[in-house]
Swiss-Prot record:
Superkingdom, natural source: Viruses
Provenance organism: African swine fever virus (isolate Pig/Kenya/KEN-50/1950) (ASFV)
Family affiliation: Belongs to the asfivirus MGF 110 family.
GO CC terms: membrane
Induction statement: Expressed in the immediate early phase of the viral replicative cycle.
Protein name: Protein MGF 110-1L
Subcellular location: Membrane
Pfam families linked: v110
Lineage: Viruses, Varidnaviria, Bamfordvirae, Nucleocytoviricota, Pokkesviricetes
Record carries keyword Membrane: yes
A repeats by residue range: 1-146
Disulfide bonds: none
């Protein structure tokens, strides 16, 4: 019986960390429970919208403004593996392909690096303690020694989880008006009217991130103060100008999106 318990103990790392998500084969209609994820990344895909009489309402975000049915809404296919997701815009040729992080995984590279480091450490630790348990059981058959080692194993696991949590907490980007420089490309794709994206001198403003962006005159377009927040599982920015306008997105959302700009233009027209 004790031998079976030891074998089970050795497989704890696999049970804890080798959990695989249910694969999603290529399909034009993702699972309903995943619509919130896909319609954040691929908001222009037809599976996100319910269109009747030329008016389309978003299936995932009920408070989303209705839009007119037009070429903005494209046919898409989605494909999810255990470690990444892909969606294809199939209504144009050649197909446009976007690879994203799946929403089940927290999405920043630093986070994944930390997770991988601690997973490896925990796995080695479990196997090391498990091997010591087996050796002691065979050599001494000392129940007291085995109990001590089990307690040590539990303490090791709890301490490692605490250290991991503290490391992740320290790296969170708290609310602030200026995001870290490494994230400017992300923020300036979505909130390109925010003042932290521009370097203005003598009334002429140049984009800090996209060097090929033509210079523009300093005007109200870029006089918005923006507050950004980067949490572990989502990012959002608030445009502070006359009234608040909040946009929530996945932190790993692909850059150079055009659907958001197009949507804003259509809403302005409406």
């Amino acid at each position: 019986m004790l031998g079976l318990q030891i074998i089970t103990l050795l497989f704890i790392p696999t049970l804890l960390y080798a959990y695989e998500l249910e694969p999603l084969e290529r399909t034009e209609t993702p699972l309903e429970k995943e619509l919130g994820y896909w319609c954040t990344y691929a908001n222009h895909c037809s599976f996100c919208w319910d269109c009747q009489d030329g008016i389309c309402r978003n299936k995932a975000f009920k408070n989303h403004s209705p839009i007119l049915e037009n070429d903005y809404i494209a046919n898409c296919s989605v494909y999810r593996r255990n470690d990444f997701c892909i969606y294809y815009i199939t209504s144009i040729k050649p197909h446009k392909i976007y690879r994203t992080e799946c929403s089940e995984h927290l999405s920043h590279e630093w986070h994944e690096a930390v997770i991988r480091k601690w997973q490896k450490l925990l796995t080695y630790g479990f196997y090391l303690v498990g091997c010591v348990l087996v050796v002691n059981y065979i050599r001494k058959r000392s129940l007291q020694t085995i109990v001590y080692l089990l307690v040590l194993l539990v303490i090791f696991f709890l301490l490692s989880q605490l250290m991991l949590y503290r490391e992740l907490e320290d790296k969170k980007h708290k609310t602030g008006s200026i995001p870290p420089e490494r994230e400017l490309e992300h923020w300036c794709t979505h909130g390109k009217y925010c003042n932290f994206c521009w370097d203005c001198q003598n009334g002429i403003c140049r984009n800090k991130v996209f060097k090929n962006h033509p210079p523009i005159g300093e005007n109200d377009f870029i006089r918005y103060d923006c507050w950004t927040t980067h949490l572990l599982n989502k990012c959002y920015y608030e445009k502070i100008y006359k009234h608040f306008n909040t946009h929530i997105m996945e932190c790993s959302q692909p850059t150079h999106f055009k659907w958001y700009d197009n949507l804003m233009k259509k809403q302005d027209i409406m």
